[in-house]
Amino acid sequence: GPQQQHRL
């Protein structure tokens, strides 16, 4: 499935 990146 699609991957999500989290940036702060």
From Swiss-Prot:
Quote the tissue specificity entry.
Answer: Expressed in seeds but not in fruit pulp.
Lineage top rank: taxon: Eukaryota
Record keywords: Allergen
What this protein is called in its record is Allergen Act d 13
